[in-house]
Amino acid sequence: MNQSLVGKTYPIIQYEVGREKIFEYARATLSTNPYCTDHEFASRSHYGAVVAPPTFVATYCYRAMRNVFEDEELAMDVPRIVHGEQTFEFGEVVKSGDTISTTVTITDIIEKENRAGLKNQLLIMTTESLNQNGELVCKGKWTLVERGGE
């Protein structure tokens, strides 16, 4: 991968959080949490709307991270990419009707030799997602591993 792109921040990507998308996500993850699955219950709650589960971050961040995957200058070998790790710092709750704006920054590219003597590259990215009021909803750190080839 192209080391010169460390520090690059990609354009902001906006995501409109729809109630149906939250319902779909909740069904896919087998959630029974009424804040995420029951419109009437959630509307009467102190949130006033259907609430996205914390892991919904993958939905709105994925669109922003596509810029990284599609960046030809980065020269990422996408078929060799596997998930390394991720960490999150959550802020405001994400609700249906919110507009989430996410930026992605490449914070590091590290080369490490694996046990087979092949060179893996670790791509470390950070995301920052704000709601329509400019409030932080999530900061993420994502590590992807490009497995070394022969």
Show the residue positions of the predicted features.
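Hot-dog-fold acyl-thioester-processing enzymes
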Residues: 1-85
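HotDog/MaoC-like acyl-thioester-processing domains
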Residues: 1, 90-150
